[in-house]
Structures are given as structure tokens and as C-alpha cells.
Amino acid sequence: MLVNTFNLFVIPQVYFMRILFFFFGLIHAAAFAQPPSKPISLKSKNQWVDSSLDKDGWKYFQDQYTDESALSEGNEEMPFVPSLLESGKDLFSSLTGFSFSIRRFRMKGLNNRYFSQSINEISMNQLSDGNIPWANWGGLNEVTSNNQYAAGLKENEYQFGALGNSVFMQLNASKLFPQTTFTLNLSNRNYHQRFAFTKVWSENKKGWTIATSVAFKQGIGGQLTANEFIGFSYFFSIDKRVDNHLFSLALLGNRQMNTRTAAITKELVDLTGSKQYQPSWGLQTGKVRNANWQFNHHPMLLLSHEYNMHEKIKQVSSLLVSMGEKYTTALDWFNAADPRPDYYRYLPSFFTDSLLAQDLISQIQLNPSQLQINWDHLYWINQNSTTDKRARYLLEDRVEQSKKVVLNTRYRIQLNNRLLVSFQGQYRLEIYHYFKRINDLLGAAYSINWNQFAEDNLPGSTAIQNDLNNPNQKIYVNDQFGYNYRMHLQQWLFLSQVQYTLPKFDFNAAVEYNATNYQREGIYRNGVFPQNSYGLAEPDYFRNGQIKMGLTYKLNGRNYYYFRTAYSTKPPLVNDLYISPRISSHKQTDISNETAYMAEAGYILHAPSLKLTANAYWISIHHAMDVMSFYHDGYRNLVNYTLSNIGSRMMGLEFSMAYSLSAGLTLNTAINAGKYIYLQRPNYSVMADNEQYISEKGILYIDHFPITGLPQLAVYTGLAYRSNGNLFLNLSSSFMANQWLSFNPIRRTYGAAQNLPSNLDNKLISNPSAIPKAFIVDFSAGYSCRIKKFRDGHAYYLQFFFGVNNLLNQSIVTGGYEQLRFDTPGGDLNKFPNKYYYSAGTLYSLSIKWKL
């Protein structure tokens, strides 16, 4: 039934043939007709562009794809063809990494756990959710740009890698580029000003190297009325070289507080006349106040030791110690009306009487503040509802505190000029503490640690107690309440890799084994689950592994063909294993390791006037799990939808090209054409928060349903001009299509279709919700000038960069989701309509850097 919805995946054959013939002509001309180029020594570090701009597409030319001198040698019929070198991003990622991000593009359609990031050889991926906590080092762009990149299954010597891509960051002071820089950024993005200072000293005669960097970001207002952002980032690293040993210490972190944006319905856009409307703020005594904040601060201490045991043997050991906290704020209420101004019962669409609906529209037009939080009213309710001023409303923090210890050791052995082997072991311990905390009582005197939903469904019972060990607890500002538990996660990992280089072939392989265990520790004894919520639960153990192999054929120093394949198994994420860890230790019944198969094949051309990459990929993932929690109108309760046996398949083509039209002028193109679908029919079960049994079981009818939340077709085209290394101009466009909203599983069940009124077509309920196509135009320019040159050779430089995104000033849909609440009896999609995120229109960034 749903197969017909995928016609948009198919690009017309005539269009494809024209593209193929065009590119074939370019390849033939560049790869086989051009004379060899003169040897050119490329700089391995960017010495003039501003690395703090988070924009890689316009500086692809600085990435070191191959060594040009080796290329010219490769054209001289040498018996040994050099291997392809990549110290920076591959061409496709460099062009698309920034431009496609507006639509949440993910390479190959993979989720976050199939991408990896490491710092000083320690993986940053979290065991809890598989995510990479980029915010932990945000703002330190001047030092964190020192990294290497491996796309897909490409070989690397640091980690196994990932199916998506891998980034390996080195923050040892002695491996950073010596510099003294002052940077000022002005922007109309989330933050408006950024000030940064970075100083990296060269290694002195006694073997010491020191590096430091600090940055401050802040912004108030701008595109969004209640936007606020403040962040302070810091970095310090010191190295000491003693004979064959290098000892390193690095301390870094980012303390950041900022408001968040919410998705909105089209009805709210029509009512307010703005796609930038946000329901999470209002006026308090005439001043703007936002209820939706997030905070993050996780300092990291990294210790490392490199020991060159032999000219062919190297040992690298690293230790990570990190602890910190992040939280989001939100309004909570008890026995009171919903304070959110966008609550569906407060909107005209809720009323079936057209006169009432029109009257409400008129009220909103006369008083737009009706669609904002009425803070003064919340304070009045808290102070006047009861004599003891017990809180009806409060502002809560949803807190996650973490402690991490990771130890990694790797041996690198160069057996001969052709054979490199490495062995690696890693131990990881992560402890997470989850709880709610009172941020502000909003004028009330206290609150009570009770479960409102249990009181509604089980009146008069002990189920109302969030903590039976401390019943009827009065709570105040900064007290914990609601839920309170810890997760103890451990993993042992062993890895072996081999890289073998032959005159015409390169071969690589890697094998990894890992053992993971999870254990929940309840700090509260929940009133609904008194026997299954407090103390340590039974641990879960998982054994998994990965294997990958790759073969590259080196036709000559310009043309490379490769094939790579991998098989991987991963434990379920702990957040998908437990049904509702907030209140109990209950787990899914159908628990299994997630398996993934991947194969990719491609071609790389690196000629003097043309650089080209083409990569075809096929990925199949099975036995994935998920948990969704939301309020269910049918059960009149918070419910947890558990999904198991989720399968998916991603296949497609990544193509990128940089063609030199003339001296200094380059045409850039990148295309991702994919087809990402769910396979099979996952199992689902429903368990309410306040019930100890499964309420419903079944299967989801999503076989061949599109994977949602990202564009499956994306095209980048750009013209870049560079003059004498001092001036850079880039004009580019991005087209993105074939994207759908994150879906509601209820609408794809048998029960949803059976309960619909006879006059409704069930396809209207089950078909995916598409997002409109998007076309974006960007512009960037950079200029560098030397202010003063000294006799010893060093000089002062002043560098400028100006970037404008979304030149056409469109407020496009960047993403969204189907609401998890659904009108099951009536099938009315307008009762809980889709919610969308919108871009903020034209954004600019001006950067000025002074390099000493």
C-alpha cells in the first residue's frame, strides 16, 4: 500500500543519463588527457582561513586528499602506486557538512550511534544513547579543528570507525599549530557575539609545550523574541617530552546556558502571522521570561602517554575523567489548568461551534499575549489557591548528572614498509543520575512529592507517593522530586587492525569484541511499583563484535577504486531497554542485539583540475529497539510504547566533484540520492506509567515506510573563487527533498484503522507526512592581509570572513513530527496536528581574526 509513496525517490532516467555523460566527459578529459602536474607541496594546516566559523564547505581545497608530489611520481610508470592520503574531510563531507545541516541531513540515513568521535584516541560516544556530546567542547573551534576524518568504512589506525563517519581529534599541546590569535564574531544566530583568545607555544628546549584557549559567547533577542544564550569555553593543555616519552595533560569544557525552541502547528502560524512564534515565553511584571532553558557543563580531564618503544613500535595510553550536569527546564502543575498557551483546548480548532471559534480568534487578534505564558497569573494562583500556599505551578529542572572514566591503550607496530598492525583495549565506566529538581516555586511556599497521574487514576492509594521511603515529603527550591534513579554502564573493548600495502592494492581489516553491562539503581521506592523500583536491579550483559574489510585498487596516482564491507552487532541502548526507568526496572520482553550489514564501493579521482568521488552504499539493520513515552488520550495516562524487531535498509549514491574552470575559479557539486526505508513489521506493546501490566500488544504496519527526519535527496552546487591565497568568494545552493516527519506509531496499528469512521480512508491516517522541498542559497567571502612582517620571518595578519545563509530569506520547514497524541475514535488529524520547526530566515556571521 505504501510502496507507491516512494515515486519521489526515482530520478528520471533521461536526467540521470545526461548527468552520467557529462561527468564521463569530465573524467576522461581530466584523468587521461591532461599532462602531469608539477609537484605542489600542500600545507597540512590551514594558515589563513578562520577555523572558528563552523563552515567547512568553502574551504575544501585546504583538505589534504593526496600528496601532489606523489601524484606526479605516480604518472611515471613507477611499480609502486602511492596510497590515498586524507588528513581532513573527504570532498563530499566538506561540501555538504554545513549546507545540508539546515534539514538535519545525516550521511547514509544512519542514526547517531553509527557515527563516532574520539579525542586523544578515547571515544566520546555515550553508552546511554549513542550520541556524541559535541556541546561539551563547543566554542573551542581554534583547537578542536585539529582532527582527522574517515568517511564510511575507510581505514584508520585509531579506532574501529563507524558506518557513517569517524572524527579523530588530537588535543595534545605539541600537536597543535603554534599560534596567537584574537577572534571576534558578530552574528544574528543563537549567539550574537563571540570573543576568543588562543595561544599555542612551540616546544621549548626542555621539552615543554603549552596551549590554551578561551571563548565567550552571548546573545539576547534577535530573530526570536525570548532568545538568550551565554557560554564560556576553556581549554588548557601541557606536554612534556622526555626521551622517547611524551606525557600530556588536557583540561577542557564548555559551560553553556541557552533557551530552546519548540515546534509549532500551522494553526499557530496563521493565528500569529509568524513562523517564529514561540509558546514558551511570556511577560512577568512587564519583562520577558522564558520557561524553556537548557544548561550543559561537563569538564573533561585527559591524560595521555606516548612511548616510542622501538622505531617500529609505539604505545599510546589515554585516560579520560569527566563529570558534569545538564538539564532542561519546563513548567509543571498539580491539580491546575494547563499553563501552556498552545494547549490544544485553548485554540480555535478545538471548538466545533464556528461562532465560538471565531470569537476566540478575535480575542487573540485583540490580545496577542493570550498566546504567551501568563507568568503573573501563575504567581497569583500559587499565592491565593490555598492558605498554606502549596504550589499549583512550578518550574522544574529535568537533570542528568554523569560521571565517566575511560582508559584506552593502543599498540602500533610497523612490521615492515608494507604491513601495519595495531592492538587496542579500552575500559569504559559511565554512571548517570536522573532526577527532577525544583527550579522556582513561582511564589508558592512549598510543594509535595506526589504523582499527579496516580492520584487521578488510583485515588486514595499509596500509588500517589513518588517515594514510599519518604511519604508526603514537602519539597522546596533545589529539592529533588518526581523520579530519582541511577544507571551504571560498563564496557570492555578489544580491537585489532591490519593495513597491508602492495604496489597496486591496499588491504585493511579490523576485528572488535566488546562486552557491555547495564544496571539500574532506584533511589526512590515508587508507589506504583514498590517491589520493582528501589535499589539495584538485575544487571543485563551483552556480548558483541564488529568486523570490517576493505580493498583499494590503485590504477595510478590519480585513479582509485575501492570496496569495503562490514558486519556489526551492538547492544540495545539503555534508554531503549527499560520501559520506564523513571519509575521502575521493568524491561522490554523482546531483547536482542542490534545487527548491521554494510557494503560500499567507490571511485576517487584526484587530477590537477578535477577532484571527484563517487560512493555507492547498501546498509541493512535488524533487531533495533525503541521506547516512546507520551500522554495517551485513550488510557488517560502517560504511556510507554515499546518497539522491538525494528529493521531498516539504506541504499544510495554519494557523489562530489570539484572542477577547476580557470585559475582560481572552481565549480563544486555534491549529490546524495538515497532510499531509506523500514523493513518488516516491528512489534509494539503499551504499558501505562501507573499500571503494572502490558495494556496492549501488536505489530506496526510500517514495512517499506520511509525513514523519517532527514532528506533522502540532497544536491549542492557552488562556485568558489580564490585569488592569490588572500581573497575567497563562494556562492552556493542546496536543494533537499524526499523528507518526512517523525511518525506516530499509533496511526500505523490495526486498532487505529479498525476504529476509524467508515467515511474515512485509512490511507489518510497511515501514509507518511511529507515535508516540502527546500532550496537554499548561501554566500561566503574571506580576506587575509598581512599587517606587518618582522626580520625573523613572522608576521601579523588580519583576517576577515563574512557568511550569509539563506540569501532568499525563506522561513522554510526544517523538520517536525506527528504528535504522539491521536484521536483514535474519530481519526481527526486536525485535533492533534503535525508540529513543525521553521528556519529563522537570512542569517549572517562576520568574523575578524588577528593572528600574531
Residue ranges and their predicted role:
Residues L394, L420-N556, P581, N683:
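Signature of Gram-negative outer-membrane beta-barrel scaffolds
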Residues L667, F735-A753, Y783-L852:
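C-terminal beta-signal and adjacent terminal beta-strands/loops
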